[in-house]
Amino acid sequence: MPSSPKERSLTAALEPSLDSFKCRRTLKADGVAYDYFSLKEAEANGLQGISSLPFSLKVLLENLLRHEDGRTVTADDIRAVALWLRERKSDREIAFRPARVLMQDFTGVPAVVDLAAMRDAMAALGGDPRKINPLAPVDLVIDHSVMVDAFGSGQAFQINVDKEYERNRERYAFLRWGAGAFDNFRVVPPGTGICHQVNLEYLAQTVWTKENGAGTIAFPDTLVGTDSHTTMVNGLSVLGWGVGGIEAEAAMLGQPISMLIPEVVGFRLTGALKDGVTATDLVLTVTEMLRRAGVVGKFVEFFGSGLGHLPLEDRATIANMAPEYGATCGFFPIDEETLTYLEATARKRNRIALVEAYARAQGLYRDGDTPDPAFTNTLHLDLSDVEPSIAGPKRPQDRVPLAHAAASFAEALDKEYGKAAEANLRVPVKGKNFDLGHGDVVIAAITSCTNTSNPSVMVAAGLLARNALQRGLRVKPWVKTSLAPGSQVVTDYLAEAGLQTDLDAL
């Protein structure tokens, strides 16, 4: 694992802001002074009403205040965010500079190749190639190269990892060279976990700091990533989303990302989930509702009393699914649960103190007395109305109540595939002593960042495996099983709970 990001400050060059709204101030957290660009002072100095903005737009506004240079970010750009409140939308384009970039190995290798090529060009021109480095910090997590060769045994994970190293030796050697050759570039090795889970548990800090000539500046953690599910970290109040490789490389080299000031759809949550209802059931319900509402190209921000009954892992599961419900991101504001999670995942005390102090000073902290922000429009879900669900047969937004699964399958077999007459057909498998038919489960995989990020559903899977074994149940010979924990933390708590053995047995 790379050196801890908890000790790491951003090192990219930061031009002094023009600070047209005279809002640079100082706060103290855990006895340490930090400079920051105060939204409250900016409101007092001309940006009227910005305290009513959605939390996600406040993060964008702070980004503009901090990077105001008169060229890529102007005072009029900043005013446009405040003017968003008039119609709750805008056609103004702004320049967003994320604090960092997250990559995985499939999309990250070309970026490292480009950096290496630029170094070669610099050397050919007689310059110092060591000057070619990412300006924004980059974390590349190797997680997209594993293939399931072995399955259904306790040795499957190690066998698959060994084969992964064997197949990708040249790529991994190249990435290891890049980690040593470039500043601001780190590589998380294979077998550590899924990039979004590693980001949530380890890399993200919610509030970042950077040494500046005049002191240490504190600001919201933001990022772009080369995977659509980068949005998962919005559950930890870190604004971020997936972009293409070219945009990611531009951000890596210090260039801003152009974007329209987005519409923000507020999603009010009330009540609490009933016993037996999982985060997966919730996220399928949310996805169905947002797909129906139409949120493509928009921010979604969650608010309401129901957040108090939603652990951060459940929030991350919902945020992870933003590509499926079509939004740019699904953002959760900082609150007590955020701080609890940062502490549970071993972020340092001074960092947690800074997150709370900064969020409260900026009006980015949500509690029971926080007024609802202004949104473009809103939706509402009572969590107690969520029921056990599955999705399919093709799309995650096609939610099916579990009680209706059999009828839904029969309908899909007829209307979507025209095979109602084959509903009871069984076909012998050559060389095997079993047959297959429509509706048979042939793959049982717990591998996605959406599922493996959530302890409640992972523990539920382990308990289900234990109960199945105790009743003498076994996996059918035609089912290919696989389990890829989202991080080493997941592996550890399954082992500590004694559930890994039960899962391995299946």
Feature locations, PLM:
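Fe-S-dependent hydro-lyases/dehydratases of central metabolism
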Residues: 2-506
